[in-house]
Amino acid sequence: MNKIVLKDYLLLSNEEHKELLDIRNKEYIREVSLDTSIIEFINHISFVKGLKNSDRKFFAIIFEDKIIGGVNLFDTKGDIKWGIFFLNESNIMIKSIVPLYFLDYIFKTYKKEEIFLDVKKENINTISYDKNLGFNIFKEDDKIISMKMSKIAFESAKEKPFLKRVMKQLNKFDFEIISYKGVAF
């Protein structure tokens, strides 16, 4: 069976951090990120060290022993926000099932009724995909769209033909979350 590992940034080796940062600093990822700057290695390591006593969780997505992206969640005033990025060349099925798995993980682990995200207005593909997952726009300004999804909307979205196909594929993968046991929220 294929395996996907979500490995906490706090547990990555220096080489894994470099691999992850190389992906994060790609122009096509920076263009759609809320922070568009190129992140220097020393600043990245400093950021990661700050996660030890934080309510933010960041995971490298590893498939076939290669980092292919990252996913995160954090608590903002009691609300869970999440985000994700992938290498362009990553398998499209992996890019579809990891969000489903991770959102399910958030609902089950953190016992929240809603999950939130912020996305740049020009990131049309992400907005469309998030709507397919069950997210709805609840606030926007000239640059950012804020979306939320209830647990009920997520479960309902899984009944759509596209997500049903993805859910069938999800069962063909093993997932492992390797997490630093710091602050829990």
Give the role of each language-model region:
Residues 49-54:
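Short loop/turn motifs at secondary-structure junctions and domain boundaries
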Residues 28-46:
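Conserved GNAT-fold acetyl-CoA-binding loop/helix
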Residues 14-21, 41, 45:
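An amphipathic alpha-helix signature
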Residues 1-19, 26, 58, 62-185:
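Acyl-donor (CoA/ACP) binding surface of acyl/acetyltransferases
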